[in-house]
């Protein structure tokens, strides 16, 4: 009878553990929301405004590329646009999970386009600079198309 009682206690403990495990919030936390909350939208708008502030300066960069002012192109990329990757990452982290990977890829390619533009400026390569500036503009606009 003592063995039977021990067996029942162990079985009951396993059943209770299993039932409690099904109802934990960890399972619910793994499922991401399909829509934005108002707090998420506010945060996204704040971070996107910081990225947009840099975007408002893109015509300046374009004018420098067009004028083939390579020193100022490099300074501009390393100065005001030096924070771009971090700012894009902040926005990306606050997107819905389904959009984060695509945003991460676009942000990475945009940063690579800026780095290539900087290399082209150092090499005085007009064609590469024009191509990388155009690629960056496209990627920048594609990134903003993911935002709500």
Where in the sequence are the language-model features?
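Bacterial N-terminal signal peptides that target proteins for export
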Residues: 2-12
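Short, charged, amphipathic alpha-helical segments
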Residues: 74-79, 101-108, 127-137
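A structural signal for long alpha-helical coiled-coils and helix-turn connectors
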Residues: 62-65, 69, 92, 99, ...
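Short, solvent-exposed, charged loop/turn and helix-capping segments
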Residues: 84-104
């Amino acid at each position: 009878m003592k063995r039977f009682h021990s067996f029942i206690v162990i079985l009951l403990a396993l059943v209770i553990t299993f039932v409690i495990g099904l109802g934990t919030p960890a399972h619910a936390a793994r499922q991401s929301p399909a829509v934005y909350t108002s707090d998420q939208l506010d945060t996204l708008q704040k971070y996107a405004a910081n990225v947009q502030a840099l975007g408002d300066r893109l015509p300046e960069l374009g004018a420098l590329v067009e004028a083939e002012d390579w020193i100022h192109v490099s300074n501009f990329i390393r100065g005001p646009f030096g924070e771009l990757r971090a700012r894009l990452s902040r926005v990306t982290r606050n997107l819905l999970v389904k959009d984060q990977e695509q945003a991460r890829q676009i942000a990475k390619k945009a940063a690579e386009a800026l780095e290539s533009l900087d290399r082209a400026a150092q090499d005085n390569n007009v064609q590469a600079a024009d191509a990388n500036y155009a690629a960056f503009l496209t990627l920048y606009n594609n990134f903003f198309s993911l935002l709500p």
